Amino acid sequence: MGHSPPVLPLCASVSLLGGLTFGYELAVISGALLPLQLDFGLSCLEQEFLVGSLLLGALLASLVGGFLIDCYGRKQAILGSNLVLLAGSLTLGLAGSLAWLVLGRAVVGFAISLSSMACCIYVSELVGPRQRGVLVSLYEAGITVGILLSYALNYALAGTPWGWRHMFGWATAPAVLQSLSLLFLPAGTDETATHKDLIPLQGGEAPKLGPGRPRYSFLDLFRARDNMRGRTTVGLGLVLFQQLTGQPNVLCYASTIFSSVGFHGGSSAVLASVGLGAVKVAATLTAMGLVDRAGRRALLLAGCALMALSVSGIGLVSFAVPMDSGPSCLAVPNATGQTGLPGDSGLLQDSSLPPIPRTNEDQREPILSTAKKTKPHPRSGDPSAPPRLALSSALPGPPLPARGHALLRWTALLCLMVFVSAFSFGFGPVTWLVLSEIYPVEIRGRAFAFCNSFNWAANLFISLSFLDLIGTIGLSWTFLLYGLTAVLGLGFIYLFVPETKGQSLAEIDQQFQKRRFTLSFGHRQNSTGIPYSRIEISAAS
């Protein structure tokens, strides 16, 4: 179409490098925390505060980032976030005290949160319907690659003097490369000019921009106008079920489950990190290949169903199988949890939690017990704090034979792998893809950021409520409750989330405008021959 720069490869590099930066920054603390503890004499509380400072910065970005994205443009937001990330990385690399480390981590958290929102929106608007699913999902693949890359660099730099400074500094490399890629892509300050440049890529007609285009305020997200309330319901439902299915806490026990099947000591942590990382990469690549063929709705339904089965399986197994102890709070954290950020990776959600009160069921439920630790530690809801938990359980009646225990432990490991895979081709990439599609361009940044803030809040709520929930109903019933929540999420997706594959952003917007509230049953064809799944409950006024 006369474009000299290779637009699709550049879009792919923007998405991949953005995700790689995101994943690297999330995971790098796992290797840097132990040398930081030794160099600065950090207590458990100080370690948690350092790790949690990233969350504070990301939360701030989710609150104000949408306005920045809509006011200054997607491309400018990405470039600005990369500059902020460079400043944060420089602060971390030169830090001489805990205060500077916390400041640097908070700045980095702000940068990666803003970049994640802007990248998903920018790429979704830049490419056509046939490429949108693959290229936006590439961000999730970049996250998993970035996490694995951070593990490799952490290992290589672990024994070097001031190695943690280099660990933080290497995050600037993908950010610089992403900025260079953006220089050859259309700008976003002039909305009309930008969209005219994008028409050959979208393969459709130019949208009517200018005075005739509707203007939206933030409060319109909660009004019936153009079915904005229905769109917000879909967006919030997806991000909330993404977290309320319990994946921030289930993956805390990855290293424990690996240890229970015979991988003890350091090998347990390595396998929990690298092994699950490899599983996530494979599942994300599968999602990339299917998202524009099978569709967003199909992947969400399949992923949520498998998550419900697998987390329920872990809960049932934990009734009978005692788990081995985990690391102490001063050990290098095993980064195998989930942050709940866009493109959510599922590898960074270890929790640092205090002792859990025993249940009133005479130990009939598996419960958590804290490993030995050097200092008392207050409760923390930080989703990436260093772990120091162990699983223990006891069942009344005769113990299972050793062979039975082994079978159940391997079953728990299989369920964990299925859970990670299901999240990685379902909620992980598809949630953010759908959010980047369903809102009008004029308010897309603010709407995306609004939903993202609820994702962070739900992640924090799940982490904070975990102890009380286990103390009340026990570990096994907690996992079974997560399974029930996944079943409810399955129903929500089936009823409310339409299929958007193969449709331009303008067509998706028009479909939402025609209905105040929709339920999705089966598949049918619209007048343009593009399949989507919904039935009309009430016509728009």
Curated annotation (Swiss-Prot):
Q: Which residues lie on this side of the membrane: Extracellular?
A: 37-48, 99-106, 156-166, 255-269, 320-414, 467-476
This molecule's function is given as:
Facilitative glucose transporter required for the development of the cardiovascular system.
> Which family is it part of?
Belongs to the major facilitator superfamily. Sugar transporter (TC 2.A.1.1) family. Glucose transporter subfamily.
Q: Does this UniProt record's set of keywords contain Cytoplasm?
A: yes
Annotated SUPFAM superfamilies: MFS general substrate transporter (SSF103473)
Tell me the segments the record calls region Disordered: 340-388
**Where is the chain membrane-spanning?**
16-36, 49-69, 78-98, 107-127, 135-155, 167-187, 234-254, 270-290, 299-319, 415-435, 446-466, 477-497
**Gene3D superfamilies assigned:** MFS general substrate transporter like domains
Protein name (database record): Solute carrier family 2, facilitated glucose transporter member 10
Record localization: Endomembrane system; Cytoplasm, Perinuclear region
Q: Which gene encodes it?
A: SLC2A10
* Residues in the Cytoplasmic compartment per record: 1-15, 70-77, 128-134, 188-233, 291-298, 436-445, 498-541
Q: How does it sit in the membrane?
A: Multi-pass membrane protein
Matches recorded under CDD domains: MFS_GLUT10_Class3
BP GO annotations: artery development; cell redox homeostasis; circulatory system development; D-glucose import across plasma membrane; D-glucose transmembrane transport; dehydroascorbic acid transport; embryonic skeletal joint development; galactose transmembrane transport
Residues engaged in binding D-glucose: Q242, Q243, W432
Q: Name one Pfam family in it.
A: Sugar_tr
Tissue localization of expression is: Widely expressed; highest levels in liver and pancreas.
Q: Which InterPro entries does UniProt cross-reference here?
A: MFS_dom, MFS_sugar_transport-like, MFS_Sugar_Transporter, MFS_trans_sf, Sugar/inositol_transpt, Sugar_transporter_CS
| Species name | Homo sapiens (Human)
The alphabetized UniProt keywords are:
Cytoplasm, Disease variant, Glycoprotein, Membrane, Sugar transport, Transmembrane, Transmembrane helix, Transport
List GO molecular-function terms, semicolon-separated.
carbohydrate:proton symporter activity; D-glucose transmembrane transporter activity; dehydroascorbic acid transmembrane transporter activity
User: Tied to what disorder?
Assistant: Arterial tortuosity syndrome: An autosomal recessive disorder characterized by tortuosity and elongation of major arteries, often resulting in death at young age. Other typical features include aneurysms of large arteries and stenosis of the pulmonary artery, in association with facial features and several connective tissue manifestations such as soft skin and joint laxity. Histopathological findings include fragmentation of elastic fibers in the tunica media of large arteries.
Q: List the carbohydrate attachment sites.
A: N334
The answer to keyword Transmembrane helix applying to this record is yes
